[in-house]
Amino acid sequence: MANDKINIHGARVHNLKNIDVMIPRDQMVIITGLSGSGKSSLAFDTIYAEGQRRYVESLSAYARQFLGQMDKPDVDSIDGLSPSISIDQKTTSKNPRSTVGTVTEINDYLRLLYARVGHPICPNDHIEITSQSVEQMVDKVIDLPERTKIQILAPIIVKKKGQHKKVFEMIQREGYVRLRIDGTIYDISEVPELEKNKKHDIEIVIDRIVVKDGIRSRLFDSFEAALRLANGYALVDIIDGTEMLFSEHYACPYCGFTIGELEPRLFSFNAPFGACPDCDGLGVKLEVDKEAVIPYPEKTLREGVLVPWNPISSQYYPEMLEQAAACFSIDMDTPFEKLPKEQQELLLYGSNGKLFHFHYENDFGGVRDTDVPFEGILKNIDRRYHETNSDFTRDQMRLYMTELPCQSCCGYCLNPQALCVQINDKNIGQVNELPIKEELKFFEDLILSEQEEIIARPILKEIQDRLIFLKNVGLDYLTLSRAAGTLSGGEAQRIRLATQIGSNLSGVLYILDEPSIGLHQRDNDRLIASLKKMRDLGNTLIIVEHDEDTMRASDYLIDVGPGAGKQGGEIIAVGTPEEVAKNPASLTGQYLSGKKAIPVPKERRKGNGKQIKLTGAAENNLKNITVTFPLGELIAVTGVSGSGKSTLVNQIVKKALAQKLNRNSNKPGKHKSISGYQSIEKIIDIDQRPIGRTPRSNPATYTSVFDDIRDLFAQTNEAKVRGYKKGRFSFNIKGGRCEACRGDGIIKIEMHFLPDVYVPCEICHGKRYNSETLEVRYKGMNISDVLNMTVNDAVEFFKSIPKIYRKLQTIVDVGLGYITLGQSATTLSGGEAQRMKLASELYKISNGKNFYILDEPTTGLHTDDIARLLKVLERLVDKGNTVLVIEHNLDVIKSADYVIDLGPEGGEEGGTIVAKGTPEEVANVGESYTGRYLKKYLD
């Protein structure tokens, strides 16, 4: 067996058609093809699954039952496999404790660095807290110039009020004759009476010594006596010189602030030892949001201004409010904003113990009749959220709460002891908040002592290597404290790449899923260089990718096709990018060679003359910008990664419009105002989330075409004779479905330490319905046959039924004709799910006043798919609607009517509008990175 290639024989996973393919090892290999052609089936479900399965199979049967073992892929043989690591976009942790720092393991090295070379600084007195052994204290004194006169003092009172008579008695009992009070030396018999209300310092004079040979033993005794009397502190007063304060434990001698021994766990917000006790290491606390509770202060109490207390199923709170208002003389018909301030405060925070009489009788005859204080709506929501055992109630209360930075730790997640430790005047929380490019500079400029340099060198190398990689893949705008759950799929994948680069493994098979997603063309070169570095370490990279630059940079290209679904699953072309470009059978090759291309529109739409205007957008890194969105156009929001695109569109525009149009309680990002929304009726977010959460959901049920098909079957003569209604043809309810598998068509068999096996139901043979239901036919086909049809076949089959035909034709129009009507929604890719949502919008009757938002709709799409997607978006705009896309793909940007380019950089250096206008106008703005790359596409 050759060691320089991976040989796959007879792969039949999903739509793969018994293919044989050779993949060269230690090279960067791209697998490309149309969406749904079988790329992921080959890369992830065949190659990765078999590599992972073989590893797990090498473990004991006991260990295997705890691991999620993968099914053996349907393939005859795979030779030359290495241990495989999959880096996709679906496995990002949503745990709030998972951050960029923890995922990349930079946090582990940072914690070690602070534990080894950090300096504890008292937060109150701003002096360094040090700890020395008696031997170190003695050495410090011995190192002083010979004949230096010193006195060793025990500081027993530090800045405390009082006359301290008992302290003087104790000193006398201990046999000491001299002490220093507020800087003046006194004999114990001559101590003055101290002012009671003044703060005093009192130190016992333990010994007076001249530095010379032979005093080490005497110094030891004196220091031990001072430490015993002053609870671990000793003060050396150099006569006519300075003072040296010593401590045998980490504690401030002035305020008593203590810190334990520095160890890495002190700097972990995921460990009780280091986490902030107030927020449990999360950095945020849930607080009731007054604006969510009272979104419309112009309303009155009677009109329901206090939203959480509006009657849904009970009159309890409305009646309580009315009776309290009567008692406290609050007018129910005055707008909340015009009520006196003290009445507003009472409604929000309660009556401060003042009672009112409350009488309430529920629907079951229960009566409450008592004098109670009025709780106030904000306190009521907070109490109910924390006290309830009901998930429903907690979820309801959560709607009116917001996360605010914890005031105790300032959002740094750590306790005061961890945050007092500094390196170059910054604590670990402050370092975690720096953008990665600034953090790199911080570590490059680090000033350490010679000994600290030796300790820190290997730790700093690990930190800097990972930070440099994050910078190289275009993520230098992120901070290490950024929650992993807030990252896009592309960002998360590139962060996991950073971890792998840091591990410096070789001989590994890496399988990646579109690492270029979410990356601006400017940053693509750096990503490609990083991928090549992984290859040069002796690894094999198999990348599912559509990006032209990445394909051209690859060593080997595999084009899967020719179509999607049943029309795909074959190897169309293999070889270098140049060889594939010359292959006339390869659709990818035609785009690489320039024979096919997405044309530049001949003219740009002018819109309907109306616009939505957003003023003062200042969320995250947005710099108080004002943006206009012309209606009736295809608008592209562009910019480098981290420039503020998602903040502008998803956090402000989408939420602000939803709040105005739908009275949505989701609070939009920081902005002054939004106007012009009266010109639209609906805001529709078409994202890549699954169209259904269960395997029972499918394209037929999602588009509601299955309702029409069931109506059609219920109208057949056979159904009428048998008395079958529409419900008989549903696989979700009893009656027509097979009860052995409950309409699933398959049965799960648990295998414990082997993966679960799914087998066709023995009763219905995978058809989902009982035999009586399957006897009803339309044009010779039963309901199960229809669900197994591809959409392309179904369009032809139902072409005489306009209602069904129109819905199915829109699915074909978005390029999904290859999927089956009954295909489980959970098997659709993100791009397929998004296009299915677009299809459902296309067949709806539109009044041309919809505002569609799409976030990177080209994710997972081949250039040919993008051409089809653009036609769909243009159909929506041609109906008078507005389509707003966040996009990096230059084919989409050049096809837009209006472009808003944010930047110029990511993070704090972004957040401004660099260019706006038609693609041609943006291309002429020299400061715009998007414009520079766009120019080539417009020529």
Predicted segments, located by residue:
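Conserved phosphate-binding elements of NTP-dependent enzyme cores
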Residues: 1-939
